[in-house]
Regions:
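Subset of outer-membrane beta-barrel
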Residues: 23-337
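Bacterial N-terminal signal peptides that target proteins for export
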Residues: 1-8
Length: 337
C-alpha cells in the first residue's frame, strides 16, 4: 500500500511539474503574434496603432487538450520621436490552459522599444518587456495513492497533494529587430528574442526542495516580403527556438495575391503552407481588407504523436487591425511600412 501511494504521488509530481516547467506559448503562425516573438517587434508595422489577437485549440482528440489565447496592442509615440527614430509602447496578455488539473498561465506584460533609423532603408529596434505571471491549477482534480481504501479507489477520500494551487512571478524579456526596407512590398526582418531573462521560479511547493526555474527561451527569426509582380508577393518566415533541452524550427511560405489594389478597397488573399519540423505541417489561408487581417491554419501531426491525435493537431486563428492617423502636412514619420 505504501509503495502504491509513493508511486502514484511521484507519477503525479513528475507529470505536473514536468508540464509546468516546459509549458510556454506555441503558435504555428509565430509571425502573427509578434510581441510574443520579440519585444523588438513592438511598433514595427505600417500604421500608428495595432491590435492583434490569437487563439489556438490543440489536441481535442486526447484528454490533455491545450487552449491558448493572446491579445496585444502596440502604438508609435510620434511626440517622442525624431527624424532619427521613434518610441513605441505595447501591452500584451497571454493565457493558456491544459490537462486534467487545468494547469494555466496568465501573463500581462508591458513592452517598450525604440526604432533607430540608421539610414533611409535600414532600421534597428531594441526592446524590453516586463510581465506579471500567475500559474494556477486545481488540486481537487488530482487522484493520489491515499484514495486507495485497501480494496478499491475511493473518490470520496480527499487527495493528499503536497503543493499549493497558484504561483506568481515577475518575468522579463529582451529582444532586437533589424529591418531592411526598399519599399512597401520589399523588405525583410531579422531578429532575436530572449524570454525569461532571470529564470523566475514557478514551483507550486510551499517550501521548495527542488529547482523549478523557468528556463530561458531563445528565438531567432527571419521574415521576408518580396514583390514578384504587380499583383503577387512572396512571403517567407522562419524561426529557430530553444528552451533548455527543447528546440524547434518553424517554416512558412505564402503567396499574397492582390485582388484589388485601390487604396479605398485594398483586398488580398494569402495562401500558404508551414511546418514545425519533426512534428506537424499546416495549410493556412488569410484575408487582408485594407487594415484588417484575418488568418487561419490547421495543424496536422505527422510525428509519433499522430497515433494519439489521429493527425489532428488543432485550429489556430489570428486577427490584426492597424489604425493610421492622417499626419500634418509638414510631419514626416519614421517610414517603417
Amino acid at each position: 500500500m505504501n509503495v502504491l501511494r509513493l508511486n502514484l504521488t511521484l507519477a503525479l509530481l513528475i507529470c505536473l511539474f514536468g508540464s509546468a516547467v516546459s509549458q510556454d506559448l506555441h503558435f504555428s503562425q509565430h509571425f502573427n503574434s509578434p510581441l510574443n516573438l520579440s519585444p523588438g517587434l513592438t511598433g514595427v508595422f505600417n500604421g500608428d496603432y495595432r491590435v492583434t489577437g490569437s487563439y489556438k485549440s490543440q489536441w481535442k482528440t486526447v484528454p490533455v487538450d491545450y487552449l491558448t489565447f493572446s491579445g496585444a496592442v502596440d502604438i508609435k509615440l510620434d511626440q517622442y520621436g525624431s527624424k532619427r527614430g521613434n518610441l513605441n509602447l505595447g501591452l500584451l496578455f497571454d493565457y493558456d490552459q491544459a490537462g486534467d488539473l487545468e494547469l494555466s498561465l496568465a501573463n500581462i506584460a508591458g513592452l517598450a522599444s525604440y526604432s533607430f533609423r540608421l539610414n533611409k532603408k535600414n532600421f534597428l529596434t531594441p526592446g524590453i518587456s516586463m510581465g506579471y505571471n500567475q500559474r494556477r491549477l486545481k488540486p481537487g482534480n488530482a487522484t493520489t495513492g491515499n484514495q486507495w481504501n485497501g480494496f478499491e479507489f475511493d473518490p470520496a477520500i480527499p487527495a493528499e497533494v503536497p503543493f499549493v494551487d497558484n504561483n506568481s512571478f515577475v518575468d522579463f524579456s529582451i529582444g532586437a529587430n533589424y529591418r531592411h526596407q526598399k519599399g512597401f512590398r520589399k523588405f525583410y526582418d531579422l531578429g532575436i528574442g530572449l524570454n525569461h531573462l532571470f529564470k523566475p521560479s514557478q514551483t507550486f511547493e510551499d517550501a521548495p526542495n527542488y529547482e523549478a526555474d523557468l528556463a530561458r527561451r531563445w528565438s531567432i527569426y527571419g521574415m521576408l516580403n518580396h514583390a514578384l509582380g504587380s499583383k503577387l508577393d512572396l512571403i517567407l518566415n522562419a524561426m529557430y527556438q530553444k528552451q533548455d533541452p527543447h528546440q524547434e524550427i518553424l517554416l512558412n511560405a505564402q503567396a499574397k495575391i492582390y485582388l484589388n489594389k485601390d487604396s479605398e478597397r485594398d483586398l488580398a488573399v494569402h495562401i500558404g503552407l508551414g511546418a514545425r519540423l519533426g512534428d506537424a505541417w499546416y495549410p493556412m489561408v488569410a484575408l487582408q481588407m485594407r487594415r484588417l487581417y484575418v488568418s487561419a491554419n490547421y495543424d496536422i501531426n505527422y510525428s509519433d504523436w499522430k497515433n494519439k491525435t489521429n493527425g489532428r493537431g488543432g485550429l489556430e486563428l489570428h486577427v490584426a487591425y492597424k489604425f493610421a492617423k492622417v499626419p500634418p502636412v509638414m510631419f514626416k514619420p519614421c517610414p517603417i511600412y
